[in-house]
Amino acid sequence: EKRYLALVEGSISDDRGLIDLPIERDPVRRQQMAVRLEGKPARSYFEVLEQFGDFTYLQAKPVSGRTHQIRVHFSFIRHPVAGDRLYGSTKSPNGLGRQFLHATELAFDSPLTGRRVTFHSPLPGDLESCLIWLRKRKGARQSRTSEQLRTCEGW
């Protein structure tokens, strides 16, 4: 089980949702994945954390774990991950030189003990600086706290 933090282009109107679209390798651009009817099932839950007008900061949980799943899903709904040129991003806030996508949590059941093991990774400094810049530039609307996200139904 993985959770990601992402900044996507545009304003997502729903505070939370599910993207349920099949994914497979793009037959023309072989280095990319694409939403295709004949693809493998892929589901991504998301919760909006903050809105910045032209960007939305969110937490995403891919259920199926397909290659580039979050990037493909959000690009398909016209909200590509900021800085992700491979999947259609045209905006990079505050000169960010990479895509704004970070694996913040990994959890699994230990094969030795059977207990749930969870690892957390804080947001890297460059991504945190980007958020600070966005908050100063425009007033952010906060939707959910991290603790509220962990208790959401379906997560």
What are these regions (language model features)?
Residues E1-W155:
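RNA pseudouridine synthases
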